[in-house]
């Protein structure tokens, strides 16, 4: 029936029968089309047609289920067009509405509703709102803790003392998190108790035989492979270098030792050999012909290996059996108490839900599981009678996105599928055993396997929701591609989405970095994507672009000091990356004069110009980055929309309405009250609010308003107010003097507020909120503002939330406000209302997770230099599905706490799993692109980063696993892979590192690497403005046609003021500006002279994280200004002077840490310091101003035109002192010194103007000029 030309592999996936079939479908492989076609072939099979309601099709989302139904419906309708009399087609079309195409949760709900009587649940149950559930959980845990405190439960008290800190909230958080975590296990009580029992070890316990020991060994072997590479590399250098062959033997011994460790199978032998090995000493031979550079290089590599082996030895020493046993025994009571606490909490929470006839989202799967499972006499988990009925009913069970299944879902699907076997616990883990089970009655036909599972483990990115990619991987490794067997797999790796350039680039990168260790799968040629899409020859594909920006931007100490900014504050790095992306987009889209990228339109069947809607910017997380990118793109006139999950509660309209609700509930809250008073709802101005506060500064603001209201209305004040009013005459005078209009405003607001408070009691919260919208006119006001449609949509969401809340068991305004507060913090805020349609011509910014399943002509992946989020590893108790609990060891009696041995193991395991998840997330991001892929990222120090990348490039085929394992950003993975690619040659040459790489990879993928820096991005803005003006002039002239005035118009529009440069010359310059200008003249003339100033956020708006270079310089200069040279004979004297500055509040204690007494003492004891001490005339921090000709600074100016232009040069001379022959000028520098000549050149012009200033001011000659360099404890003379 289908006209689609299927590949051989797709046909196998569509037509293979009578087996459990696993379809591994790579990105863009058309798995949905294959799944739909398989269903169509099943229901339209001429020999054995299957009614569509006899198929269970489980999808990941409701949208996917709806799309599948629609596709199947279209196929049936098309068949009816060809054969209108077909009874089979008509029947299937009728049955389509009854089809079981749904999400796993929809199926579970169906099972519960059809079998509610078996689990004693009210048939009228309701699924509780997420936040309603949170409120009930909080109630339950508060009540539980109170009860346990009351009965003084000893285990609970010990648990509190060990893990609760000062407040219970920390332990409550642990219980709630563990409860959520346990609910993703099929039988959560069993799992909780089993995990606690892992700590219940006896005298026979032997740590060396536990799974934890094997895990330590395997993790360490990954590192050892890295050490092996380093030693092998060293041996190659030794054998190919002159005069260091005597190093060969000790290096070879080390390599043999590493190889021996890698072969060890038992932890005991592995541990013993590492602890016993003694590194041979290197021979101390001297050979004048030896290659010193090579010798030093191999020594450094060996020292690095030795250091790491010693660290491993220390770690392994800590895993001594008796010590480990004692630790387990000590932790057992706490872990058992924790498991029991979670179970008690769950029972209390369950009771609260049952009281209200509620179930929550987790209950849906667990209740279904309890209906579908039973236990046999041996305790094995087998299908219930109800499950067996489902097995009879469903001819096939088809599961989409199988890689994202969790263990609960896997057990449920195994109960309704025709699989032979049972589930049971083994060493605390639930495992499936593929064996025959004895059922009470035979079930004919149920022995034919009927599971169809499709997915791509490389796109499993939901581990944070407890997805278990191992479920897919286990089958992938066990199933065979052989025909005619019961467990079979088919691979669909032909990509019908992307251009060859995208596919080749993705394949190259992931062959280099994805492995079983990180990614949980070896990305081999067999796993690689194959080109399946055709884009014709009309437009050639483009290389993948890697745009790197160096965060390091050389700004001297003087400039930092002058503007009082930190390097990081000079311009926000996210902002700069956003600007970089904006420039790439402008180039891609093009303009009227120059065409941009052409993309193929599938609907039109031809190429067209790229539009904004064709571009997506993907980020790992959007909360902090997306708003900055939106701002930067909007500045460039690029339409953009960010699909985020945050920011809703920060919008002005929602803040105002929540504040209004808060003061209606309780007006004695100053901050929300002032927010409402200053809003258009009340329209008080600042002066009016000050007048109100003058009534009394010690009471709530509302009480001030209440006093004014009562006295103005001649009402008597009650005793409460009388207590605060000591002088009623004074208050009456304040009110009498108060503006009549203000008094009326106060009375009007108080009366309205009282009416609203009364009304809030009598109507439902959703009605009340809508009443407030209309009553205050705020809904209309919000709509009249800029982005009014968006604001009104946000207000409607608040109304909808209130409507949901009104249906819960909680009532009242107070509880609704709590509900909203819980929503803020429990759900991590929400995104603003979505008002954009699919066809809006805007750039979209979204998280990688939200992009899964989508595709775009152009993908820009940004933020690749951002660190992975590993904050969860810092919690005091870690949880792992297979390994259980990883607690801190806390001994309250001895007051000691440290990570337990098992916590360190689990921490490392979670870290590796997190990195594997990040690897797969990167894969998802890069495979969204159809035609063009751009990757952008920031790097702290480009030279250092590239040097480290080059050190990892020995293996052409793979970035070393240990390097991938130590990666902290996506660029840490991408960089080492790309630096050795043939297309990176020019990039390496630009960084003067082309000679350092011998292993160039000649891969068919195409890459374009661009290096950007901050200065370029700042400079280009001004240049673009000038080009834009020029282009507008050209456009205007073109539109004139054949006008007689064309030449005159061009002349006028192009006119430049003769003295235009003079308008840009400042009247005053600092010496630092002058110095900077002269440096620029040598490099780039005066390109920065007339540049626009980039506005930055004030310091008080940013969080101060560290003392900046400018602050450090200022602090040291301040100390040198106040240093008493006569009392600086030793370090103690200097420390005393530092403390005196702290006492006088010149500096803080934190700031004082940058002053090194030893360095100050070295200055005092230097020859220059002694000369200064011996002088009778010392002057410090002397400000000056001198006038000089402008052409002396701006040498490119026409001297005839600008000969009379003058500039004022200002500055502060650090120090000068007088000797018999003249003055000695001294300037302190705290810059890092790399090259003495460079420092001299940098500050020569500055010192020149200091000298001239001293000559003019004192009338005396400057005999010597010095820079004192604190970084190297030395001084240099300036000639």
Curated annotation (Swiss-Prot):
One term of GO molecular function: ATP hydrolysis activity
Binding site for ATP: 25-32
Stored Gene3D superfamilies: 3.90.320.10, P-loop containing nucleotide triphosphate hydrolases
Record-listed E.C. numbers: 3.1.-.-, 5.6.2.4
Subunit structure: Heterodimer of AddA and AddB/RexB.
Protein's recorded name: ATP-dependent helicase/nuclease subunit A
Cofactor requirement: Mg(2+)
Keywords, comma-separated and alphabetical: ATP-binding, DNA damage, DNA repair, DNA-binding, Exonuclease, Helicase, Hydrolase, Isomerase, Nuclease, Nucleotide-binding
Protein origin, superkingdom: Bacteria
A single BP term in Gene Ontology: double-strand break repair via homologous recombination
UniProt xrefs under InterPro entries: AddA, DNA_helicase_UvrD-like_C, DNA_helicase_UvrD/REP, P-loop_NTPase, PDDEXK-like_dom_sf, PDDEXK_AddAB-type, Restrct_endonuc-II-like, UvrD-like_ATP-bd
Organism: Clostridium botulinum (strain 657 / Type Ba4)
Family indicated by similarity: Belongs to the helicase family. AddA subfamily.
One GO CC term on file: DNA helicase complex
Function in brief: The heterodimer acts as both an ATP-dependent DNA helicase and an ATP-dependent, dual-direction single-stranded exonuclease. Recognizes the chi site generating a DNA molecule suitable for the initiation of homologous recombination. The AddA nuclease domain is required for chi fragment generation; this subunit has the helicase and 3' -> 5' nuclease activities.
HAMAP family: AddA (MF_01451)
Domain UvrD-like helicase C-terminal: 526-853
Pfam families from the UniProt entry: PDDEXK_1, UvrD-helicase, UvrD_C
Residues covered by the UvrD-like helicase ATP-binding domain: 4-499
Catalytic activity: Couples ATP hydrolysis with the unwinding of duplex DNA by translocating in the 3'-5' direction; ATP + H2O = ADP + phosphate + H(+)
